[in-house]
């Protein structure tokens, strides 16, 4: 019989609550122990209580005092970048070897996008899940990168305003910075750029991501096959992840190069990928694919780490 590792979630907002429901319903190697918030009236804490999960509204300071904390092996932090630095320090002061999965853009640990680099980090003590936009788009950059050298990649993540809680809104600058860096570090681009758009349309629109990749000249069939293979790999843990339309290519000749401000002229192959992410509607409705891809990636990561601990 599989030993389930107990987990706590810090942050009882949209992301934390969605993740809790996924763990309770779908986890094979993890067991929900504590939901941590700072607002005693939050819907996430109320829902956790109704689902039989222990709660505290006193933040991480409250968590480390709880008897349940003694058995917790994993903590998911779904707060904000600024709060995560303090949370991680307090958790380690109490339990030095604890595994922390960071769902904020703080990035004090290595970046992780499961389909690209999870196996390199199964023993990490703090792992950063980049951002929702990063989880959706970096696999596409990496897919091109394994076929041809990528000089520049730019992503535009469009999410429904209703899916963005106060934590997401407070972290816009951190979102763009962390995603841009991870496009380079994990995606393999020499230079990365990220843009996020919160769309106030009613009814809310599903998460859409556009990925532009400028690479050396390459066989377009090979690039497309690599992208389709990567989409299938992401879809294994995010069932609503899909190509919205066929991959588009444009050959940029040496005689008419593109000028990228700040980066100079470019010729080669431009690949455009259009992604749609439909949420599983565990907490917010299906338009909130940005929640789903983040929590699904975090769950897949922790499940693999827990499995590795059991095999050790």
UniProtKB/Swiss-Prot annotation:
InterPro entries referenced in this protein's UniProt entry, alphabetically: Acetaldehyde_dehydrogenase, Acetylaldehyde_DH_C, NAD(P)-bd_dom_sf, Semialdehyde_DH_NAD-bd
Q: Which domain of life is it from?
A: Bacteria
Single GO BP term: catabolic process
Q: GO molecular function, one example? A: NAD binding
Q: What UniProt keywords apply to this chain's record, in alphabetical order? A: Aromatic hydrocarbons catabolism, NAD, Oxidoreductase, Plasmid
Residues that, per the record, bind NAD(+):
12-15, 163-171, 290
The EC number of this protein is 1.2.1.10
What family does the Swiss-Prot or TrEMBL record give for this protein?
Belongs to the acetaldehyde dehydrogenase family.
Native organism is: Pseudomonas putida
Name of the encoding gene? cbzQ
Task: Look up keyword Membrane and say if it applies.
Answer: no
- List the catalysed reactions: acetaldehyde + NAD(+) + CoA = acetyl-CoA + NADH + H(+)
UniProt protein name: Acetaldehyde dehydrogenase
């Amino acid at each position: 019989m599989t030993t389930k590792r107990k987990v706590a979630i810090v942050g009882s907002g949209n992301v934390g609550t969605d993740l809790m429901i996924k763990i309770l319903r779908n986890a094979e190697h993890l067991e929900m122990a504590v939901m941590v918030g700072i607002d005693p009236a939050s819907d996430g804490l109320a829902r956790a209580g109704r689902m039989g999960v222990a709660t505290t509204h006193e933040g991480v300071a409250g968590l480390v005092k709880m008897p349940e904390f003694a058995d917790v092996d994993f903590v998911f932090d779904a707060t904000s970048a600024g709060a995560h630095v303090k949370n991680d320090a307090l958790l380690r002061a109490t339990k030095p070897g604890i595994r922390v999965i960071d769902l904020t853009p703080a990035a004090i640990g290595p970046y992780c996008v499961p389909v690209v680099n999870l196996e390199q980090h199964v023993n990490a003590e703090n792992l950063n899940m980049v951002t929702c936009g990063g989880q959706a788009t970096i696999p596409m950059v990496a897919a091109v990168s394994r076929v041809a050298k990528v000089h520049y990649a730019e992503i535009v993540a469009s999410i429904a305003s209703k899916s963005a809680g106060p934590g997401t809104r407070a972290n816009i600058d951190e979102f763009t910075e962390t995603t841009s860096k991870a496009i380079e570090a994990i995606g393999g681009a020499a230079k990365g750029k990220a843009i996020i758009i919160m769309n106030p349309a009613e009814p809310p629109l599903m998460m859409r991501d556009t990925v532009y990749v400028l690479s050396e000249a390459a066989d377009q069939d090979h690039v497309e096959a690599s992208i389709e293979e990567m989409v299938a790999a992401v879809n294994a843990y995010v069932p609503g992840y899909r190509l919205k339309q066929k991959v588009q290519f444009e050959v940029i000749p040496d005689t008419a190069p593109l000028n990228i401000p700040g980066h100079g002229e470019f010729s080669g192959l431009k690949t455009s990928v259009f992604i749609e992410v439909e949420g599983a509607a565990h907490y917010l409705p299906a338009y909130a694919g940005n929640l789903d891809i983040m929590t699904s990636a975090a769950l897949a990561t922790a499940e693999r780490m827990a499995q590795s601990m059991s095999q050790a």
